[in-house]
Design a protein with these regions (language model features):
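Extended, low-polarity transmembrane helix blocks
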Residues: 1-37, 44, 53-65, 71-167
Length: 167
């Protein structure tokens, strides 16, 4: 096994982070799609709860945007913090009837999901993520720039295909 093969071999930690991200994001992406595809009914139900139309639209955007962010591993930390705060707000605003066992259960679930999101925000997406792919591309571009700058500084011509560049 070469060093390159070892570097690309996913570790259990990364597979666990991927699985956790996908499971956590599923809830938000599904709910965001449900609200968006049944918008009229969702607007009516949310209005009855005192939620304005702009807040409903923001909720859908947050659930879909941050949900995909966490699931794909793109700006995962930001998406996880946003969804964690959303869960805390949802728990505090909508699940306050502690005498009702169902409401108490929803409060506890929202708090647990928020906790998971905050742990994910600290842990990051792991190696199996778009963040990793994009960071790798940025690092390669920086290395290419440094190589070109070093060649220019050394006075060596650069060649691109058959064309020689004099700088």
């Amino acid at each position: 096994v070469t060093t390159t093969q070892t570097a690309w071999k996913p570790h259990l930690t990364d597979l666990t982070l991927l699985t956790g991200r996908l499971l956590l994001s599923l809830l938000f992406v599904h709910e965001g799609l449900e609200l968006a595809t049944h918008f009229a009914g969702a607007a009516k139900a949310m209005t009855a709860l005192g939620v304005s139309l702009p807040l409903l639209i923001a909720t859908i955007a947050l659930q879909l945007g941050a949900g995909f962010s966490v699931g794909l591993g793109l700006q995962t930390r930001l998406g996880a913090v946003a969804l964690g705060l959303f869960c805390l707000a949802t728990a505090a605003l909508f699940h306050t009837n502690f005498a009702n066992q169902n409401e108490l259960l929803h409060l506890e679930k929202d708090l647990a999901i928020a906790g998971g999101m905050f742990v994910l925000a600290v842990a990051g997406a792991g190696e199996i993520s778009l963040d990793r792919v994009l960071n790798g591309l940025v690092k390669r571009r920086q290395q290419d720039r440094e190589t070109v700058a070093a060649l220019i500084a050394a006075g060596r011509p650069l060649s691109v295909g058959e064309i020689k560049l004099p700088f």
